[in-house]
């Protein structure tokens, strides 16, 4: 990378890049996800336990117990569902809670499952209660109870289902009803990743996308990726764009720093919205405490977006804390933003 580009003084002419055509990137994006458990990086304890459950299911020749993954977005819940299906050599049928509006929608999916298939339901906490209720006998006895007709002529029909495994994913496990949650034999939480684990993921992705990157460059991206592989891979792709424009053959630490500065991602991984949340909390509400709804209105953001996307990382980093009276900024947040307490 040129000295001028590194300082961000002027944009160079767009140079002929040595990187492959962008269509090749799009074709390779689908292969970023690991397909085997041994290729999955991070979540060590969960991974070791899952290996035991998979081997036990294979040895018994039975469907694996119903599994619920929960944790913040982008930590690998969908990837693990795909890995389970690949490891067991069965089909993976994917849907999501909001899509299943009527019980008939779920019944149609369940009756078409083959033996030991995996049914993956993302955002399972958003599944309507009427749909959820027909799942109970399906999960316990592999039977479907359907009501045909109306009024006095209505009758119940039992349909036998093939043994299957339900894999649910949620960012809000507290919104799943107890009857449904209790029917999962395996419940696993996905934690944020360490910068070292994220750097390994970035190095793996860079090999798949044919983007040469130094170890220091990968570590720097990992350090700013909010503990989330999805964000790490997204930042790598954006840094790749800067490398292509500047004609850099290799993504190094200098280029990463320049690109992330342009993308407004600071050394702690906070973006513009993270800093806005903290700044509003400090400057408008004297650091808090303030209710989440009031904070959301002040930031022109939805409550759920703050709770699911921004708040978990800010709390984990020690920039924000929850109290019975509302959210508060910490001393660490004041120092990070160079504001006076």
Swiss-Prot record:
Example of a GO cellular component annotation carried by this entry: Holliday junction resolvase complex
Pfam family, one: RuvB_C
Small ATPAse domain (RuvB-S): annotated segments: 194-264
Residues the record lists as binding ATP: 32-33, 74, 77-79, 140-142, 183, 193, 230
One example GO MF annotation: four-way junction DNA binding
Main localization category: cytoplasm
Chemical reaction(s) catalysed: ATP + H2O = ADP + phosphate + H(+)
Coiled-coil blocks: none
Enzyme Commission number(s): 3.6.4.-
Role noted for this protein: The RuvA-RuvB-RuvC complex processes Holliday junction (HJ) DNA during genetic recombination and DNA repair, while the RuvA-RuvB complex plays an important role in the rescue of blocked DNA replication forks via replication fork reversal (RFR). RuvA specifically binds to HJ cruciform DNA, conferring on it an open structure. The RuvB hexamer acts as an ATP-dependent pump, pulling dsDNA into and through the RuvAB complex. RuvB forms 2 homohexamers on either side of HJ DNA bound by 1 or 2 RuvA tetramers; 4 subunits per hexamer contact DNA at a time.
The protein's name: Holliday junction branch migration complex subunit RuvB
Organism: Lawsonia intracellularis (strain PHE/MN1-00)
Protein's gene: ruvB
